[in-house]
Amino acid sequence: MGGIFGVASKSSCVLDLFFGIDYHSHLGTRRGGMAVYDPEKGFDRAIHNIENSPFRTKFDRDVSELQGCLGIGCISDNEPQPLLVRSHLGNFAITTVGKINNMDELIEDCFKNGHTHFLEMSGGNVNPTEMVASLINQKASILEGIRYAQEKIKGSMTMILLTPEGLYAARDRLGRTPLIIGRKEGAHCVSFESHAYINLGYEDEKNLGPGEVVFVTPEGIEVLQKPGDKMRICSFLWVYYGYPTS
């Protein structure tokens, strides 16, 4: 399992991002990561191993060094992320939570389509988040790429992409894992679990439906793809992994 969180704010997002990710610590024990965007400094990222120390301890120093009004991050039980990507779609960061059951098939398809290599290897396997980025980059726009990734992946994949303009948030096409939008004055957040933003002053704004894609800025949200009509939630998340107040 794992948890993801993102913030689009008119002021610095770093503290909200830090605590929002930390509130997902019950969902993973291996890696934690933060990525932010600042118009002057560009993209910046920090990833740490949290197997022997909690997220809050490992990232305490990064909070004072990272700058930006837009950011995403994660608690991961598997691969290191978020990843920073440069492609024909521009520069973006991406974080995901889910499981790809047809990874070998997707790797072969990528090689046939001219993709020459994968850089991020985790435990001898291709990093699933890099695979998602590779699928997105095969299309003419980020939205088309997200749709394509949702169609090609057998399993489950929920994601947040960070661009210089805002955040793309996409829930798994069958709604197996949740994604929720919160709001407060001057900011919006995207969260895997709702309890992560309640203590940060956010209020519930929107629960994304299965396969729904939205674009998030400090001013508001824009629905780019409406939700589907089929829902298959991960009941194990609700009864075991999930935090009770969510």
Model-identified regions with their sequence ranges:
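Conserved short alpha-helical segments that host acidic/polar catalytic motifs at enzyme active sites
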Residues: 1-246
